[in-house]
Amino acid sequence: MSPNNQNEYEIIDATPSTSVSSDSNRYPFANEPTDALQNMNYKDYLKMSGGENPELFGNPETFISSSTIQTGIGIVGRILGALGVPFASQIASFYSFIVGQLWPSKSVDIWGEIMERVEELVDQKIEKYVKDKALAELKGLGNALDVYQQSLEDWLENRNDARTRSVVSNQFIALDLNFVSSIPSFAVSGHEVLLLAVYAQAVNLHLLLLRDASIFGEEWGFTPGEISRFYNRQVQLTAEYSDYCVKWYKIGLDKLKGTTSKSWLNYHQFRREMTLLVLDLVALFPNYDTHMYPIETTAQLTRDVYTDPIAFNIVTSTGFCNPWSTHSGILFYEVENNVIRPPHLFDILSSVEINTSRGGITLNNDAYINYWSGHTLKYRRTADSTVTYTANYGRITSEKNSFALEDRDIFEINSTVANLANYYQKAYGVPGSWFHMVKRGTSSTTAYLYSKTHTALQGCTQVYESSDEIPLDRTVPVAESYSHRLSHITSHSFSKNGSAYYGSFPVFVWTHTSADLNNTIYSDKITQIPAVKGDMLYLGGSVVQGPGFTGGDILKRTNPSILGTFAVTVNGSLSQRYRVRIRYASTTDFEFTLYLGDTIEKNRFNKTMDNGASLTYETFKFASFITDFQFRETQDKILLSMGDFSSGQEVYIDRIEFIPVDETYEAEQDLEAAKKAVNALFTNTKDGLRPGVTDYEVNQAANLVECLSDDLYPNEKRLLFDAVREAKRLSGARNLLQDPDFQEINGENGWAASTGIEIVEGDAVFKGRYLRLPGAREIDTETYPTYLYQKVEEGVLKPYTRYRLRGFVGSSQGLEIYTIRHQTNRIVKNVPDDLLPDVSPVNSDGSINRCSEQKYVNSRLEGENRSGDAHEFSLPIDIGELDYNENAGIWVGFKITDPEGYATLGNLELVEEGPLSGDALERLQREEQQWKIQMTRRREETDRRYMASKQAVDRLYADYQDQQLNPDVEITDLTAAQDLIQSIPYVYNEMFPEIPGMNYTKFTELTDRLQQAWNLYDQRNAIPNGDFRNGLSNWNATPGVEVQQINHTSVLVIPNWDEQVSQQFTVQPNQRYVLRVTARKEGVGNGYVSIRDGGNQSETLTFSASDYDTNGVYNDQTGYITKTVTFIPYTDQMWIEISETEGTFYIESVELIVDVE
């Protein structure tokens, strides 16, 4: 059904953004759907376009029922709307709501459902007596809470009535004691994880109850001491309950870690459901403190919640399709690393561009699936629309479909998944997704439809509804029904078992709608802004995973400097004054500074924890700034800095809280500065750029022109803009680099790059797009450098000319810059982040003052020398004689090999500097002669290695078409040829292994031929995996047997007499075969390789340590001997057994091949 039982959806144009034809139906943007669609909901449409089987709707892997999760989400949402000290009537209605949610009726057992679902998820049963006891206690608590709620309502109707006051106060005390006695029943040893969701809901109610003592205690007649004791218990239990929930959540999650995709799915679902039912509640616990929050309070949850991967995952008898999570080759850590985002600043999705690929399956040319194979996201930070970030996932193709969110939230996604499968191959993909959107603050809905065609069987398709996992309340208008908005989309692509199964699936990431998109600060409420909702994090600061009770990630800094900036929106009068406090944890005392324009607030914050201690509830404390302040603008920006502590100490920031407390001379100077900057770009004749002018300087001049007053100097601004636009055109025309503005990374032309590089727009340092390069990735024991490169072809170069690579580095650590031709030029840049002032100058509307900022930047650059820490860089490369056949061209590259490294860079250009002459020309000519001599040597070396490798490969084949292997070829011949091929030099570039070298073509030619030989070798051997390259696959082996890598060869090792290896396989009866075994025996005793058929015919080859004295073929280098025996089986089934009597038996290969003699 459509959300809120409505079909009034706008359908946004689903046309691809390229000219590539699409199999999808196309819809115009319209307020009313077409006649053919106006009565059709998304399920009907998906069935029409994708052949959906209506019996397969829903997600069978959803462990926690939608109604149960809706209960948890509803309770959290209701609490978020009643934080601080709410009106008394709100408290009474809140308890009524809670009772209705957790104890809806005698026929509906929410608590039992929670227990059963968690039992299923962790594959463990709650013992009967424990469950019965817990359910009995919960029933009693529900009854008591219902009575208390009714008594509270009675008293609130007449607060002066002594009898109702006495009743409610007595029932408060009785209910508190009920909780104290009942809660241990939800924390039974051995059942902590199973009962965790029940425990969290129960202790949440207890803390809310204790809050009532602070709100109503005085009116009920409690003494100040009694009220204080209730309050102190509440504070103490808040810490105790919080730490308990986080501890057992982590223990439960850790127990679900595994190695397979199936174990990952269980782990993933537990994480999601426990976040919604447990951790979201825990994050709200401290807000019940009426001393800290005596007025209405806004809190926010910034954690990410991931729905299940959108991939076919049901067991069906239809065709050959299988659930994706049952494939053993898809590993736990692969999926986790690909689909779960690392800790990050809170971001807001702006647009989605989906890339489509066409897949097929082996031996069926008519079968196909057009599916979602990758996507590009654009997103921004909170309250900041000036900087756009881009993230690419999966495969980027030419067929694209895109849509922008603008002022809308995606609140539900319904997707069709398909498994195109036959006996030989399985393809997984998403051919359709329906994105349901609502205009923020209204119930006006639109929808975007991504739809592609496929030929998968009906029973091999499935519909995923995000509302199965993050439910919607269909009983209220859309604006009130959704609790989460789509914030990101990750993905995982896989190709396993030689592409026997392959595919790609997106994973939708959601954030809670309590996370305000504008960082709104209210004049009549306490406003909490999580630290991850900053718009910029300065270098050295990091986002780290939250401890579990903060509702999201937190910020960390280990050295004194600026932490970051926060854009805010003030809702109320600018005359209102505020006091600020910070929730933090720290291993050291430090000074915290807040900057707001000219206002600077400082305070000394104390250490809260010891070095090496874990982050617990008690390690986080609040500290306030003493003086209050006013905001200057409705849209304002705050900068936070930490100082006066030793590097290596740790400071964590959870959130910032704002508590409301009862033009002509400068314009002329700006014009003169802009004129000077623009004039400096051109030659005296104004028809070309001045030599040495960089693209960065052109952009910065444009910034100065942009800041000129439209009112005072409209004509001057127009003329200067025309001039700077011409300068930009000239700058682009001379640049030999493709895609210097970073429109696309890893596209068909231009830049090739490693993963993780971000394209960023609109930064204060860079006017246009620039790149953010992360440090090298560490995976297991391997380090994978971050790299970016492109080639400038020989055809665009001039002979005997100097070119120069230039660019601008905002900041960097360990950035290596290369130009490569016959030789490699390299520089390393370690550039401090010191261009901008600590507090950015702003205009009256709160935006960054580019003119003032440019003056600061210029002053910094003017005093900068050309050392390794300079922001600008320039790297020359001289071109001599051109060789279009060799096409060496110029390779431009950037690399970071240190995991701690980073860089931001832009305005990259490769420009012609001028012809070479004099000493420079003579030096280049000498270098070229030396290069030619060196190349002659390299070619001679290459020819020797190549001819030896080619001859070795040629000897493997009996024909010139490489279709038949020589009958006497053994595995040693293949490995010898492989070693020769690997010895071919200059296959890849020395600095960038991703760049092909001079012998890449020869190397790949021989590698492909060798692979063909391996394939033929495997095909002719009647014994599967006879060379043990696939370990013990196909073999039956006792536990002590293993396959070892010895001299780059897979060798079966039988270490003891009681170990054995065997296999049953199929042959052609009455066909003459030769059993050929290459093996080596160590120590006393014999090794045996025996074969037999179903007619009890058998042959045995015996190996001993003294085989070098007997017949057989002996390899002096390896110590292995090859023995053969002829065998004619009578049956089609044969058996082989390998064993030994003593010592160790090494078997390199076992072959049973047709005797061609």
From Swiss-Prot:
Residues 1-29 are annotated as: Disordered. Keywords: Sporulation, Toxin, Virulence. One of its GO terms (biological process) is sporulation resulting in formation of a cellular spore. Residues 15-25 have a biased composition (Polar residues). InterPro entries: Cry1Ac-like_dom-VII (IPR048645), Cry_V (IPR041587), Galactose-bd-like_sf (IPR008979), Pest_crys (IPR038979), Pest_crys_dom-III (IPR005638), Pest_crys_dom_I (IPR005639), Pest_crys_N_sf (IPR036716), Pest_cryst_cen_dom_sf (IPR036399). The keyword Thylakoid does not apply. Pfam families: Cry1Ac_D5 (PF17997), Cry1Ac_dom-VII (PF21463), Endotoxin_C (PF03944), Endotoxin_M (PF00555), Endotoxin_N (PF03945). One of its GO terms (molecular function) is signaling receptor binding. It comes from the Bacteria. CDD domains: delta_endotoxin_C. Belongs to the delta endotoxin family. Promotes colloidosmotic lysis by binding to the midgut epithelial cells of Coleoptera. PANTHER family: ENDOTOXIN_N DOMAIN-CONTAINING PROTEIN-RELATED, PESTICIDAL CRYSTAL PROTEIN N-TERMINAL DOMAIN-CONTAINING PROTEIN. Toxic segment of the protein is located in the N-terminus. This is Pesticidal crystal protein Cry8Aa. It comes from Bacillus thuringiensis serovar kumamotoensis.
